[in-house]
Amino acid sequence: MASYLKLKAQEETWLQRHSRLILAILAGLGSLLTAYLTYTKLTEQPAAFCTGDGGCDLVLSSRWAEFLGIPTAAVGLLGFLGVLALAVLPDGLPLVKRWRWPALFGLVSAMTAFEMYMLYLMVAVLRQFCMYCTTAIILVAGLGLVTVLGHRWLDGGKLAFSYILVAFLTLVTTIGVYANQVPPPSPLAVGLAAHLRQIGGTMYGAYWCPHCQDQKELFGAAFDQVPYVECSPNGPGTPQAQECTEAGITSYPTWIINGRTYTGVRSLEALAVASGYPLEEGR
């Protein structure tokens, strides 16, 4: 009886028997999805079913849509292709049988941490729903579950420690990369921001507006000194903030400088002229 129970315990579950196939299917779907998003980003075409006034279009056009100068979707594509390769490679190849599952676990752990950060940005920072991003997150979560449950791991404690370590390193690297993607402000941006604050020149915008993000990026970190009014604190389609309504704001971004209204993204030089800031002081 004892030997029979031991034999039953050693039998593979249905998930363990089919885990590589399931991983290949999930990774294949993820590869197709991220390849499509990479294509739309590189060709500057809108993704299907995305509108220009909210949702996935705003997420996919945000500054987090690029990572180290390439589309963030391309990073996901590399991850999914890596999982696909590890899932389908035959055991007969050198080192594959021994290192397949440790490599899968490390790669999927990194992908999971990266996607969780993307989820945080989507929910807490951009506050927009992106069906493509959500689908990618679900696929990566599926890869994580199958990787953990679809293989007989000998040391659960070591596995948990490894995940924490990989996730920590991935998050630190990701946050560091995005933090350094914002260039230091130019002397013109610093001086102009201080001047706008002094004269009360104000930008009216919305956190979900991609053109507002473009305007902010022209200032870089100096934008923190620019007077700014958030006109849509509750998201697209909700009532405008009273201060914006009273100011007659109808589009974003809008500047009101010295009593005059300027709509759309404006260069730093144009804002300097409008506000009376001497350009030579910012050189």
Curated annotation (Swiss-Prot):
This protein's UniProt keywords: Disulfide bond, Membrane, Oxidoreductase, Quinone, Redox-active center, Transmembrane, Transmembrane helix
Effect seen on changing C130 to A/S: Abolishes enzyme activity, also with dithiothreitol as in vitro reductant
Disulfide bonds: C50-C56, C130-C133, C209-C212, C231-C244
Main location: membrane
Keyword Cell wall biogenesis/degradation: no
Membrane topology: Multi-pass membrane protein
Stretches of the chain found on the membrane's Periplasmic side: 42-66, 124-128, 180-283
Molecular functions (GO terms): oxidoreductase activity; quinone binding
Segments for region (Thioredoxin-like domain): 186-283
GO cellular component labels: membrane
Broad class of enzyme this protein falls into: oxidoreductase
Effect recorded for C212A: Abolishes enzyme activity, but not with dithiothreitol as in vitro reductant
UniProt-annotated site: Important for the reduction of the redox-active Cys-130 and Cys-133, residues: C50, C56, C209, C212
InterPro entries the record matches: Thioredoxin-like_sf, VKOR, VKOR/LTO1, VKOR_sf
Matching Pfam families: VKOR
PANTHER family: VITAMIN K EPOXIDE REDUCTASE DOMAIN-CONTAINING PROTEIN, VKC DOMAIN-CONTAINING PROTEIN
Domain notes: Cysteine residues from the thioredoxin-like domain participate in a series of disulfide-exchange reactions that regenerate the redox-active cysteine residues in the transmembrane domain.
Protein name per the record: Vitamin K epoxide reductase homolog
Phylogenetic lineage: Bacteria, Bacillati, Cyanobacteriota, Cyanophyceae, Synechococcales
